[in-house]
Amino acid sequence: MEDSFLESFGRLSLQQRQQQPPPRPPPARGPPPRRHSFRKHLYLLRGLPGSGKTTLARQLQHDYPRALIFSTDDFFFKEDGTYEFNPNLLEEAHEWNQRRARKAMRNGISPIIIDNTNLHAWEMKPYAVMALENNYEVIFREPDTRWKFNVQELARRNIHGVPKEKIQRMKERYEHNVTFHSVLHAEKPSRANRNQGRNSEPSSGSGYWNTYTELPNRRANGLYSNEGYRRGGHHQGY
């Protein structure tokens, strides 16, 4: 009796095991998630007057024919190609250049090259913010010239006649080893501090004051409306 019961229980257990679905295999593991890859790039050029920024910008545009170059200096070129700097319009010129860069980013242009002196991290912050908003990778570039911090040679080479004394003071204020993080979190000094620094510089009539503020959308009378890059490539419509 007991043997018959055990035999029946064994057959029942075997039937139950046979009716149970086989265990599911563990889910297949796909490849590890890829790090974000930027498809668009913003080059922020930095350097003292005469260090070779414009030459570097042209070389980048040669390497990347779709590149657009934006320089605050463009604001002060007249239609006949002459350069006429007005220090009272400099902050407006920076704001104008930032608008052009912003429009190009919204249109997905890549790469975009900003050809300014960019002495301080905070001066590049508007462009870094734009890059973050429009998914651009920021690449900082300086000219690789042997004279890029040689004040006497810079005074001789720069095309706007910036004197040696002014370049020396710019060199002393130049921030080295900037990063995207430091630029993004940089604080703009107060207007009083910026004016104090401006008044301490010798007057040269050259356009090398990298300041940024929000100003009305207007252009200087007599300045060209075709906003092409007067020292190199062309980008109509910006």
Curated annotation (Swiss-Prot):
Induction: Up-regulated by USF1 in 3T3-L1 cells. Up-regulated by FOXO1 in 3T3-L1 cells. It comes from Mus musculus. InterPro entries: NEDD4-bd_p2, P-loop_NTPase. Residues 1-36, 183-212 are annotated as: Disordered. Residues 20-31 have a biased composition (Pro residues). Interacts with dynactin subunit proteins, including DCTN4, DCTN5 and DCTN5. Residues 192-212 have a biased composition (Polar residues). The lineage of its organism: Eukaryota, Metazoa, Chordata, Craniata, Vertebrata. The keyword Repressor does not apply. This is NEDD4-binding protein 2-like 1. It holds the Pfam family AAA_33. The keyword tRNA processing does not apply. Might play a role in adipocyte differentiation and triglyceride accumulation. It comes from the Eukaryota. Transmembrane segments: none annotated. Keywords: Developmental protein. Gene3D superfamilies: P-loop containing nucleotide triphosphate hydrolases. SUPFAM superfamilies: P-loop containing nucleoside triphosphate hydrolases (SSF52540).
